[in-house]
Amino acid sequence: EAGGASRFFYTAKASTSERDKGLENLPVLTPGERSGGREEGSAGINGYAGTRGENGRNPHPTVKPISLMRYLVRRASPPGAWDPDMAKRPVVLDCFMGSGSTGVAAMVEGVRFVGCELGEESAEVARLRLQHAYALPREDGEAPVVTRVGGQGKLF
């Protein structure tokens, strides 16, 4: 059906526990700290989508749910893409990696991933989340490879 609701995929926002997986060694931040120092109750803090009024460790304001990113990785991959030879599998490129949700999804789905992030804080959060994802079971049962390369940003 053209234009119907069945064309849409819905998933809830990433929970605080999902946002913070792999970040156990980072300090807990208040919503004000996560939004750049706004005070509780000030204009903008209550409606700020990235904070939702909860304490957490991930300072990134728009962490995507892993379930949504896994869905998009599968939808964007060509049929038959899961070749036993990892070198022949699709590559997911995320030029603005943020907190690394797309990379985590790619690892879990068993496809290759290249991510770039200029923001040092976000790059560190993404690195920690990707290291945590390294231990997650993948769809194909093989272990992913994470590489860190210096420069202006970080490449995973």
What are these regions (language model features)?
Residues 1-156:
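Class I S-adenosyl-L-methionine
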